[in-house]
């Protein structure tokens, strides 16, 4: 089963992402609220996928992504950030991100990115009514 590490300094955003992933039938193995914790949790849990915010106290998401990629060149990282300027997206890809999702988050966009990054064989079911309601919440 594919496992996901959610990294965001905002508890509400982590909660929304967890609910989105669970509504898609995916397993959230851990959460982190900083880049440092993201790197530690990546080493501890070896998740199939990491969703990473950029702007966090301490180590930011771009630096954490680079460190994770140094540890595992095959790591799969999706950046989820409100900072979506063109240069930021380029920096995210250069740091190793496989996709970039601009906030506010939408269930359909999350589902598409997960399928793209993890591969077409991923068992992602259509979001249920509750999942779609959660996806409408602005993050």
Across the structure, where does each feature detected by a protein language model lie?
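Two-component/phosphorelay signaling modules centered on CheY-like receiver
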Residues: 11-30
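CheY-like receiver
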Residues: 112, 119-139
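The feature encodes the CheY-like receiver
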Residues: 57-60, 85
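Active-site beta3 strand of CheY-like receiver
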Residues: 45-51
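C-terminal output helix
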Residues: 87, 105-114
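Acidic catalytic/metal-coordinating carboxylates
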Residues: 34-37, 60-63
